[in-house]
């Protein structure tokens, strides 16, 4: 089967400190799957996938930054893989590629 990469819109997560936005993180992700049928299915499911990723990262990123003091791309990739598999089932998402992550301080 042919490996296909499905592009996602950038994921934007605002990290809060107190009642204010401390940083905005933008993550560019591609989802790896096999076969055109799977790619079409994932593309149709993208609103659900994107929503699940954003919801999870809002809770997960502050915890990661607290322990790691930085955004760890490998941990982020593994986390999104788990979230994707929970949502879509095992085997559909072969891999998650985190192409870039940009943290912009607020203000």
What residue ranges belong to the model's regions?
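Flexible, low-complexity charged segments
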Residues: 1-107
